[in-house]
Amino acid sequence: EMCIRDRAQLTAFTQTLAQCRELPEDFIEDMIMKAPSPDIMNKLARCVLALYSYDEQPDDISIENVLRQSIQLVAQLPTIMSYAYQVKRRHYYHKSMYIHPIRKEHTTAQFILNSIRSDRKFTDEEAKLLDLCLMLHAEHGGGNNSTFSTRVLTSSGTDTYSAIAAGIGSLKGPRHGGANIKVTQMLDCMEQEISDLTDEGQVADFLKRIIHKQAGDHSGLIYGMGHAVYTLSDPRAVLLKEQARKFASGTEFEEKFRSIELVERLTPEIFAREKGNKKRVCANVDLYSGLVYRMLGIPVDLFTPLFAVARMAGWAAHRMEELISGGRIIRPAYKSVSLPGVYTPITQRTEAQPHSSVYVPTEERI
């Protein structure tokens, strides 16, 4: 059983992460600064794959070695993310780039706040809030897209760096890790289109227009509401909402928090009325995480990369579990929905008789 049993072990583990935070010599210059990326998620994946070349035992998939690799990646991913963001600031936004020295006494949350802020200052409350965000995003079962991707690659016997890079690539997708950005964009759109963010009628009308694809990104989706697993409530959202309320109270973010509360309260009844669907709809973690990040001064560029930094621990745990108990390669079955077709040699094909199989409509499938 691998677990941290007391504060002494926690301190030792925190110190281990701090000692592993540094990247290999010249890695920052060669892998991060020389090839700026418009999306930091791609830079994370590229750098993780590059770290394979710096490992003396990259293909050793013994649990001991994978644990070593995983701890190093848990420690180094925040470093890569922070430096990649600074390089993006300089290259794409033409702003100053800050590369601060790593302080070994910092926790992961403290390191991130220290490295992305020009003055390096943060409060204990800010670090605790970011730490909570990282913990809430660290693990969410093996069925989510990025973790399943990691397990699929692990089952093939590939190396740790390839498996984790696949997870990062999956998480980049707007239907997965990019969902909190979609929430932020939706709320920004609402702020532009209505005059009072705390007016229940105006917010309700905006949500109704979203459902009918007349507002937002015209997808018909109210981002931050609903979950594939949770129906009554998302416990992560409950915790973040409580903390967001405390941090927003008496600040410029209080009105935004109240508007998000309205979205959470009004969406189920509007959804039921407009769609005739009685399914329970609850807020998910993405509804409040974007506001929390903004209150911490974290730029949108880092919303999804922060998710990856947090989920690295979960990916590592699932990879080791798959190595220990999997045994077989994961190969989902796919059933063809077309009728058999006769192969026609290319020299005998005509426009009137192309080589093609016949598609079977969903309602006619057996």
Annotated model-derived regions:
Residues 5-366:
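Non-transmembrane, aqueous-exposed alpha-helical and coiled segments at domain scale
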